[in-house]
Amino acid sequence: MKKIVLSIIFLILLSTNSFAQISVLGELTRKYVVKPGGVYEGTIVLRNKGDKPHDVKIKKKDYLFDREGKNRFEDPPIHPRSNSDWISVSPSKASIPPGESLNVSFKIHIPQKEDLSGSYWSILMVEPLEPIVAETLLRSENKKLTMSLKVVIQHAVQIITDIGDTGTTKIKFVERKIVNKEGKRFIQIDIENVGERWVTFKPIVEIFDQDGKSIGKFEANRARIFPTCSARFFSDISEVPKGKYKALIVTDGFGEKVFGTRMNLNIED
């Protein structure tokens, strides 16, 4: 069984190496501040670094994620803040010769609607025109088994449109707790974007002893969260000794607006 698993992994590596020669040049996130009724343009440059031509297609997808690590890339629309219907792409299919580049143009047509507010987003997904099909012959105890695998490598470019400076900015602290993983101790902070604009920030945890004296600030990872989505942050507090503490959790990245919460800590091991 171990040999079979290793053979499958090796097969996947061989079959995907070809399309892996296609790369996206430039930023993978395109942000636009827009007005209702406006038209905005952009270009995605695809490069074929291989020695064979590759056929590609560009598809519009909607994208959502949550704090549990679930990601949804699905045909639009799957949420009310999708801008996929506003976007046109040319070409949507093409063949890229070896060693050459392809310019994919897109236009964003913002609807003339007064009720547009906040952030809207979607994904332009670059993938092979047909899934790569690879076959291999696996041998085990004088038995032969032919397996066919379909493998798809995708490159995603996010298209974000903000309607001016409109829309509310608001987050919700869903859960805070101490967790242990990989021999270290963390404060896990789950945050949901309940506003109308995308946000990017990192939580900062300041811990106080029973006398109210600060014993240090501990930064978590940074993340971007779209409206209705959520993310999980971890702040390493392994160096904090056993004891009871109070923690103040605040978020940066919101200018003069600060979001925060408090929690009690009981570190026992």
Model-derived regions, located:
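Beta-sheet-dominated interaction scaffolds and their linkers
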Residues: 20-54, 93, 170-182
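Short edge beta-strand/loop segments characteristic of extracellular beta-sandwich folds
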Residues: 43-47, 186-194, 236
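Sec-dependent N-terminal signal peptides
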Residues: 4-18
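Terminal connector regions
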Residues: 52-64, 109-161, 242-269
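Short acidic, flexible loop segments centered on an aromatic residue
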Residues: 56-79, 192-211, 253
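Short, solvent-exposed loop/turn segments enriched in Ser/Thr/Gly
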Residues: 26, 37-43, 102-104, 115-123, ...
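Intrinsically disordered, low-complexity Pro/Gly/Ser/Thr-rich segments with frequent PxxP/GP/PP motifs
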Residues: 77-113, 210-241
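Extracellular Ig-like/FN3 beta-sandwich strand-entry sites
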Residues: 39, 53, 101, 117-119, ...
